[in-house]
Each structure stands twice: as C-alpha cells, then as structure tokens.
C-alpha cells in the first residue's frame, strides 16, 4: 500500500455521515473518527500540493498520525448520531493507536425500591428493572452493599423477598413482620420514607446509628455495638464531603476532566435530591501529550456511563467545559432514554462551583496518583523495546500440562502497578502441543476484545514462534496491542533450566534481546512471567486431581486404559465425555462401553 493508493482512496469518499479508519503500512489501525460529511472531514487532514502530506494546520497529534497513514476505510451511516455510537464501539473494541481508551468496563450498583410490592424493600441492581413503579438511588461507586446493610440495621424493614411467617429478623427486632400483618402498610411506608431520607442524607443515618450504638453499649451488648460502630466508620468513608448548598431538591450529574504530566483524570458526581450521594474518579495514563483530545474523552466517558441497560435518573448533565459533540450527545441520550436530556456548561452559581470542585478534585487525583505510583519501568520498556503503547495494562499468558494430560492455559493481568486478580482467566485446552495450546488461548482472549477491551501489551511465555503467533492473532483482530515474549536460553536446541543458570531472553517484533540479570526491565518481565506460571501450575494441579478422580470412576466401570485414552484424545476432558451423545460414544468405543458411561 502506498501514498498513491491513499490519494485514490480519498477521491472515493462520499458526502455523507459515517465513520472513517486510518491504517499504517502493516495494516494496524491507527485511528477511528466520525464525520458529518466524510469527504470534507477526511480530506481536511491532508494537503494535496505539491504532493499528498499532512495538513500543517492540524495538531501535532493529527500530523504524526497522517504521516503513518497509507490506507483508509469508511462506513457510511444514516445519521451523525449513529456514526458517533459506531465510532465509540470501534474505539472500545479495537483500541486504535491514536484514540484514547478509557478502561472501565464495570457496571456500578443502584439501590432501588419496587413500589408495586405491598411492603417494598431495598434491593440492589446493576441494570434496569423492567417494572413500572421502581425508584432508583445511585449509582454507588463503592459500598452499596454495606450502605444497604446499615439501612437494614437501623430501619426494621422487610429484608427477604418472600416470607410467609415471622423470621429470624423479627426475633432480633430487625423486622416488624409485615408478612404476618403485624404492621399496617401505611405505618410501614412511613418507616420506608424515613429510610429513603437517610439514604439520601448520610448524616441523618450516621446520627441514628450513633444513637443505636450508644444504647447497645449502655445495655452491655458490646458485640452488636461493635457492628454498628463498623457501619458508622464505613458510611463516613463513603460520604462525599462537599460544602456547597444546592437550593433545589433536584437530580443531576457532573463530569470533569483534568490532564497533567501525561495522566488523564476523570471525575463524576451523582446528585440526587440536592445531595451528592456518590463520586467516582478514574486515572488513565496517556501514551504521550500530543494524544490529549478533550472532545473524544467526553464522548467516551458519557456514552460509557449511560449505556442502554442502566438507569439514567437525571435529566441534566453538567460538564466543566464545552466540547465539540455536546449537542449530538444530547440527541443520542434523549433517544436512548426516551426523555429530554440536556448537557450544560454552567456559567455562574452553585452548579458552576460544583463543576469547578469536580475539576479541582480531578487535578488533585493526578497529584495523588503520581505520588503513589512510579511509572518509570513502563516508560523504560516502551523506549527500549520501541513499543507503541505505554504498557500500563499488561496481559501475561502461560500454558501447563503433563505429557498431554490436564491441558490448561492461564492469563494474569497487571494494571497500573498492581495485579488485577478480577481479570485473571483460566482455560481448559483441547490441544497437546505448546504452539496449538497458545493459539487456542490467545484466540479465545482475542474473541473477547468486544467485551473486555484489549490491553497495552501481551507478554507470552515462549520464544519467537509464539511471538509470531501472537502477532498473527493481533493483526487479524485489528487491535493495537504490543507483544513481547520471554523464553529460556537454548543450549543444544533445548531450553537451559539448570538451577542458577537459566538465562532469559526477550523477543520483540524488533528482534531478540539478552539483558543483564540485574536489569530492572528484565526483572520486571520475569516477575510478570513467574506470576502467570504460578497461576497456570496451580490450575493444572487442581485440574489433574479432578481428572484423576474422574479417571478412577471410569476405571471402576470396567473401561480399559486404552478406551479412556481414546475418549480423552477425542473429547479433551472428562466433562465432555460425560456430556457426549450416546450415538457418538458408540461409534468411538462401542455400544457396551457407551452404555456404561451414560448409565453412570
């Protein structure tokens, strides 16, 4: 592909809305953007005389991107709103080099009350509840379950979904047994209203709990008093302390961004009934300063926080500053939630002060992050191995088996200087050789890029062959992920693993590297590899134990070791053998053996 091809592609652009994609010489996706008019927007990136080159009027970030571009593709859409949604989806799934990806695939819990019930109770959800009389509170970015427990600790409301007679909560004075009509609905709803008021005003809940703790202590019920004390400490930790009075009892959201020293900080306040009930902050290291794009980040931040399957309680979203696609986002959210949603930039008054406060806190979070975390090693890796991404989000892969038995793979995740164990994954594998096993693991991970965004770096436990395999999978996925592999030095074509003499080599797409055993970069990569190895070995051992147990069960049925090996070779694991169709088993090992398996 050449610049001449690119010039011809520019001539084919239509005068319609859509999404465009830029690719480099290797076919890697560089950037995804949306346009009201594809022809005008894309051509604005270029100057055409004396020959095709980057338009010098654009930012350094855009000029650098265009210098790398040799190919473009586009998708026409029916509207600019459709284009924006598609653009956001591509960024999340494909992780283009010059787009910023906000890594937050979490959904946060809401507390809700279903007023269709005769005696409503507090419940937790992460999605819309399809009922007509639902009242939501939140989202709560931390401590939703603990907050709910505190409410139930003080207010004697129904806790069980269904109860036909007084339960343990009634016996310990934590419920008034509405199931047995020991309280009227009117009186019950009065208590519920008090609890809702406390939910929206944590200071009220704190005062009530402090009174309860004092009474319990005076009655020498120290164990229960200690529980209440712990609840008080938790709520104080959750409470958002903002000394700004909001005159109206209204609901709205606030978003602010801050950028400093190659770190992006985002902050969200949730205001309900005139009170800031929760706040969420996120830190995202940016590859370099020229990739800061305020409009792109606001779009991504707001669309990801208000997806179609979660509640949007407020009708107004306030942002710290203006951004290009604000009005378009209003249109998308209004259509998505079937009500008028406004995104505003307040100029004066309490809303302006809250937006300023959000921005100041976003800046403070950057300073706090930089004091707590040292990104030196990531910067050294990026520079030394000529990586495209700053490797803050790393996935490390390893496989484990014993002579083709209990074949498993493992992935561990290292994110912003700590292990993210919630993202660890285990794989049961069909193949028996290392190459095909790694292909299976990496392919399965790549197929999930639409659900769990790709990392900055893949680290493979293996040599150049597995590095090339990983490259093949990444290229076919169209995502922007760097790749490194780490392997033992080979002597006489065998990996040298003698204790004290095992030397590691690092493989990258730029070549092979032998680093000193005292090199911090090597030690860091070894630490990552060792954790993946530990996790894979542990999973292998547990799998082997289970397979040995199941193997003994098959042996007890009178099946020979030859039959069992044949079954395992075909089905891969014992679970699949037991689930296999009788007809397939019969064809493989005969009717008699098949009957024994299915009958037991």
Curated annotation (Swiss-Prot):
CDD domains according to UniProt: GIY-YIG_UvrC_Cho
Domain GIY-YIG: 15-100
Subcellular location: Cytoplasm
InterPro entries from the UniProt entry: GIY-YIG_endonuc, GIY-YIG_endonuc_sf, GIY-YIG_UvrC_Cho, RuvA_2-like, UVR_dom, UVR_dom_sf, UvrABC_protein_C, UvrC
GO biological process terms on file: nucleotide-excision repair; SOS response
PROSITE patterns attached to this UniProt entry: GIY_YIG, UVR, UVRC
One Pfam family this sequence matches: GIY-YIG
Molecular functions (GO terms): DNA binding; excinuclease ABC activity
Membrane-spanning intervals of the chain: none
GO cellular component, one term: excinuclease repair complex
Keywords: Cytoplasm, DNA damage, DNA excision, DNA repair, Excision nuclease, SOS response
SMART domains (alphabetical): GIYc
Coiled coil: none
UVR domain location: 203-238
SUPFAM superfamilies linked: C-terminal UvrC-binding domain of UvrB, GIY-YIG endonuclease, RuvA domain 2-like
Description of how the protein assembles with itself and partners: Interacts with UvrB in an incision complex.
Protein family according to the UniProt entry: Belongs to the UvrC family.
Role noted for this protein: The UvrABC repair system catalyzes the recognition and processing of DNA lesions. UvrC both incises the 5' and 3' sides of the lesion. The N-terminal half is responsible for the 3' incision and the C-terminal half is responsible for the 5' incision.
Protein name per UniProt: UvrABC system protein C
UniProt organism field: Campylobacter jejuni subsp. jejuni serotype O:2 (strain ATCC 700819 / NCTC 11168)
Gene that this sequence comes from: uvrC
